[in-house]
From Swiss-Prot:
It is an enzyme of class 2 (transferase). It comes from the Bacteria. Pathway: Amino-acid biosynthesis; L-lysine biosynthesis via DAP pathway; LL-2,6-diaminopimelate from (S)-tetrahydrodipicolinate (acetylase route): step 1/3. PANTHER family: 2,3,4,5-TETRAHYDROPYRIDINE-2,6-DICARBOXYLATE N-ACETYLTRANSFERASE, ACETYLTRANSFERASE. It comes from Leuconostoc citreum (strain KM20). Catalyzes the transfer of an acetyl group from acetyl-CoA to tetrahydrodipicolinate. This is 2,3,4,5-tetrahydropyridine-2,6-dicarboxylate N-acetyltransferase. One of its GO terms (molecular function) is tetrahydrodipicolinate N-acetyltransferase activity. Its EC number is 2.3.1.89. The keyword Acyltransferase applies. SUPFAM superfamilies: Trimeric LpxA-like enzymes (SSF51161). HAMAP family: DapH.
Length: 234
């Protein structure tokens, strides 16, 4: 079970991290001053590109005409970098936003537009569909499916609070919301649009607002909600 110490480590990481405003600057002209070691430079003396923190790059380009500078920037005083996805043994589609300190299991699938916050855990073979949101410390087991637009509420603070925990072989339908601290048991199905405010027993189907048990999993339900292994191959 996730402990308060785990949460406290994340809180400490965010609080103590150096806040950066990452930029990519294309410039034409002569820079002012020496380029810090923490800034990457590509190109020549009077034309090139700088990559680094705005606080270090801004003085270098301050004397250049505005028309000779193009700045690309998508964050301000950011405390948590994005995950380095190159070594992840999973399929991650363009447009997914995944913060650092996220764990992704083998053969998982992260679709376009998914947002996954710090401390989240995704089991092997699990699919996070388009536009789904996994809040801080949310946990999803193996071979599960989180539907498009679904939200697993995050809980970084208070540190003592329990995160959302989704079991193995669970299907969470499109646009469903699972509230902080709720646990969904193995093999359960959460219907599309449901708002889950209480724990869901294993092998049950819940639906509605708030979500209530409507039946036990049967063979017909299993056929309708079966996952396709071919979609998880690399």
């Amino acid at each position: 079970m996730t402990t308060a110490n785990d949460a406290q480590q994340l809180i400490s990481f965010i609080a103590n991290a150096k806040k950066v405003t990452p930029v990519k600057v294309t410039y034409k002209g002569v820079l002012t001053g020496e380029i810090p070691a923490t800034v990457q430079q590509f190109g020549g003396v009077s034309f090139g590109q700088l990559i680094g923190d705005w606080s270090e790059i801004q003085p270098l380009i301050a004397a250049l005409p505005a028309e000779n500078v193009f700045v690309e920037n998508d964050a301000r005083n950011s405390a948590v970098p994005l995950l380095d996805k190159k070594a992840v043994n999973a399929r991650i589609e363009p447009g997914a936003i995944i913060r650092d300190q996220v764990t992704i299991g083998d053969n998982a699938v992260i679709m376009l537009g998914a947002v996954i916050n710090i401390g989240a855990e995704i089991g092997s073979g699990t699919m996070i569909d388009m536009g789904a949101v996994l809040g801080g410390r949310a946990i999803v087991g193996e071979q599960s499916h989180i539907g498009a637009g679904a939200v697993l509420a995050g809980v970084i603070e208070p540190a003592s609070a329990q995160p959302v925990r989704i079991g193995d072989h669970v299907l969470v339908g499109a646009n469903a919301v699972v509230i902080e601290g709720v646990q969904v048991g193995d093999g359960a199905v959460v219907a599309a649009g449901a708002i889950v405010t209480k724990d869901v027993p294993a092998n049950t189907v819940v639906a509605g607002v708030p979500a209530k048990i409507i039946k036990q999993i049967d063979s017909k339900t299993q056929q309708k909600t079966a996952l396709i292994d071919a979609l998880r191959g690399l």
